[in-house]
Amino acid sequence: MLEQMGIAAKAASYKLALLSSREKNRVLEKIADELESQTETILSANAQDVAQARENGLSDAMLDRLALTPARLKSIADDVRQVCHLTDPVGQVIDGGLLDSGLRLERRRVPLGVIGVIYEARPNVTVDVASLCLKTGNAVILRGGKETHRTNAATVRVIQKALKACGLPEAAVQAIDNPDRSLVNEMLRMDKYIDMLIPRGGAGLHKLCREQSTIPVITGGIGVCHIFVDSSAEIAPALEIIVNAKTQRPSTCNTVETLLVHQDIAERFLPVLSQQMAESDVTLHGDERVMQIMKGPAKRIPLKPEELDNEFLSLDLNVVMVMNIDHAINHIREHGTQHSDAILTCDMHNAARFVNEVDSAAVYVNASTRFTDGGQFGLGAEVAVSTQKLHARGPMGLEALTTYKWIGFGDGTIRA
């Protein structure tokens, strides 16, 4: 089954690569319209997925990721329309010039070909990924989690209906709707057809893909994000940033999970932190020293060492006291996932050190980690947030779904 999908996707990718920006935007507009016209069908499928997930005991954080509402679906359709307004990178000449030999050389952006994406309980990923792939002339094979298989199937049918209406092959966007996990292993070996693989899920999925895939893999999306409150930080703005980074949407990968507090500000900062976190219903995890200082109304529980590596995706926050900026940087190096980390400080020397020494995809000074997002960065919808250094890093927008080719123009030109 998968080989036939691969063959069809590869054939579709050749046709997509030839589309003009105007033709691709027409397809995206049609997809957005169909998503809105088929809202009831998609929400009905999603309701079944949510009910099954709740029955299976999924956490509130996972249920939040899984659930669609009319407003969320409208937002997804609007995101597709926003992709229409993004600059199409395909065909752009990155650099080039006339060589001494007389050969005129160009390095031009082109589609990657076929993208494979494996993801878990995030139904919006289906549309986000499909729209970005189509905008860049790529075909895509999707493998969503079993928790969302009804939602994904309904959504892909809507997308394929739009493709067909625009005279394009339905195989440009395909989904593996069989929940059999063995198909993931088979997909990982489809290097004959899939040019790049993007896993969006937990550490186990990323490990499986890195170890078993014969396809180039882009990993990321696991966010053990840190905020370091330096000794010179202004308390009121710091609290506002922390509340935003922890509570705006706790189930996202750019949510802060560990707060590092300089020991020189701890006596003044931790009690007011407890007050603020109580108002946001956040549970604070701290060691004995932190617990003694962090008096206040917030719920507090002892910090377990293994929790320093946790991506909670919930209203839980580790609080760790550090001696200085060196201690903070070393902690992030040991426990971070190279996703998003921030420093809150009025000391620009320390800010510069943090920016230069913390090796993460996104580093912030006096700002929330929640900004690590394709839309916030002006990239439009994102296919993933890469925490590696090749071939993309940070929010992956349109350019990350392209490669380039060298094109030489001559006039009977030969090499001397």
UniProtKB/Swiss-Prot annotation:
Keyword annotations of the record = Amino-acid biosynthesis, Cytoplasm, NADP, Oxidoreductase, Proline biosynthesis
Q: Cite the Gene3D superfamilies for this sequence.
A: Aldehyde Dehydrogenase, Chain A, domain 1, Aldehyde Dehydrogenase, Chain A, domain 2
**Catalytic activity line of the entry:** L-glutamate 5-semialdehyde + phosphate + NADP(+) = L-glutamyl 5-phosphate + NADPH + H(+)
Q: Extract the Pfam families matched here.
A: Aldedh
**One annotated GO molecular function:** NADP binding
What does the UniProt entry say about where the protein is found? Cytoplasm
An example GO biological process term is: L-proline biosynthetic process
Q: Keyword Amino-acid biosynthesis: yes or no?
A: yes
What this chain does, per the record?
Catalyzes the NADPH-dependent reduction of L-glutamate 5-phosphate into L-glutamate 5-semialdehyde and phosphate. The product spontaneously undergoes cyclization to form 1-pyrroline-5-carboxylate.
Name of the protein: Gamma-glutamyl phosphate reductase
Q: Give the classification, highest ranks.
A: Bacteria, Pseudomonadati, Pseudomonadota, Gammaproteobacteria, Enterobacterales
